[in-house]
Every structure is written in structure tokens, then in C-alpha cells.
Amino acid sequence: MDIEKRLDEIWGADYLNALSPEAKTVLERGYVFYNNEERKDLLITGINPSFREEESKGQLGFNTTKLLEREAKHDVYWSPIRKMLYNQDIDLIDQTAYLDIFYFREKEQTFLKRELLSRPEGIRFIVDQLNLTMHTIEEVIQPKLIIVKNKESAAYFGKEAEKRGWIWMGYALEQVCNTYYGELYKITGLIDSHERIAPEITQTALVGTLVLFTRHINQYTKRELRPTAEFLNRLLHIQSQGIDSYPIEDL
């Protein structure tokens, strides 16, 4: 899958000419993507890459493996993620992929709702990006466990479909239990809805995949609220054995 080629097509689409001047700033900044090229057991997702004023504009592609290496330099975003993936006895780094479900660069979280979701062309811009993300997850990564590391992005997986009618990627989710680190769900299929943003995907490769909806994690998040390598490794083991055969109280 040529992610960069598809992003170039999205960023060059004619309908984006109708965006507001403020919304067009994200087009000028370019996009960020992660080079996910193989299957991984664990996928961590954010919502969109940030943009710091001192950063240069342009298209950027990153190697997730290098960003997650233990020896990588300290970073306010990546260091807390790394600490979730290993301890003295467990190392999940090589089993882990990362992506942001959207590719535009913006620090202000209200920008998405204010400038994009409020306009038809903005919604189309979001849908095109989310379609690419879903294909990447389904066809390339095919994870056994997904950590949705941002409450704002949970709805795009289909978590609010029943309560609010928000379909987006439209995964059919069955709640397993609440854990100290977040809500644990299992993917059982795809929601039967014409509103799914990737109707060409008629069957999901992720049946049985566990999804942990947790909070945004940064350097200020209390240590006891961050999922640990031991906990994530246990979830991967549970997924491989079958969640129905595992005592939920052990979580």
C-alpha cells in the first residue's frame, strides 16, 4: 500500500479549495504518516500529529520502530508510549505499530470540530483520511490488540454508533469489561450501515481483536493510570487464547 501516494491525492483534491482560509493552513503544513508495512500484534493510535511553530512545513514519513526504540532520545510524546511497552521481563516494541487516524498537522484539538467537521468539504477531507487509515489497519497491520490512546478518536472506530449514531469506520464492538486503564471491547464484525466510510470493505480481518479505549497519555499522566507492559502482554495472551475462556475478574 502506497500511503504517501494516496495522501498526495487527498491533499491535491479539488474540493479542498472550498475550505475556509483557516482550515487551509493544515494543507499548507503538509501531512505526517508512519511507515507501517507489516503485521503487528499491537497497534497504538492517536488522533492527528501535532504542529509546533518551530517545525518546518512539508510531508513527513516516520519509521515507528525507530521512534519506539529504548535508546531513542527523550520526547514528550513518545517517551510515555515507550514506557508502556517494556519492563525488565517484557519487551513489546518489535510487536507494536503506531498511527494517527488523521494525517493533518495541528496542535489545537478544537480545530477538527470547528474547521473541518462543520463543513461538507471538511467532512470529506476527514473521511478520505479515515478510509486510508482503515485500509492500513485491515490490510497491513491486522493487530490483535488496539490501544485507542485518545478519547476524542474513540467515536471514529464506531464506539458511539449505538448511543449517538456516529458510524465512521463502523466496527461492531462488544464490551468485555472496564479495566483500571480503560474500557475493553472486542471487535465482532462491521456495522451494517451505508454510512460506513469504507463500504468497499465488506468483511473485517479484525474479528476477535481487542480494543482498549483509554485516555490521552503524556508525561503528566500519573504512572498508575498508564497501561503497563505486563497488562498489555496479558491482553495479547488473552486474545490468543480467546477472551470467552478467560476469567474477566483477572483483569
Question: Model-predicted segments: where are they?
Answer:
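Proline-aspartate-enriched helix->loop->beta-strand connector
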Residues: 131-154
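Charged, often glycine-rich, active-site loop that binds/positions anionic groups
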Residues: 97, 101-126
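A short acidic (Asp/Glu
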Residues: 54-57, 108-111, 150, 154-162, ...
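A structural signal for short, well-ordered beta-strand segments and their strand-loop junctions
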Residues: 42-46, 91-100, 145-150
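C-terminal capping/extension of enzyme domains
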Residues: 1-10, 119-131, 157-251
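A solvent-exposed, charged loop/short amphipathic helix patch at secondary-structure junctions
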Residues: 55-72, 113-122, 167-174
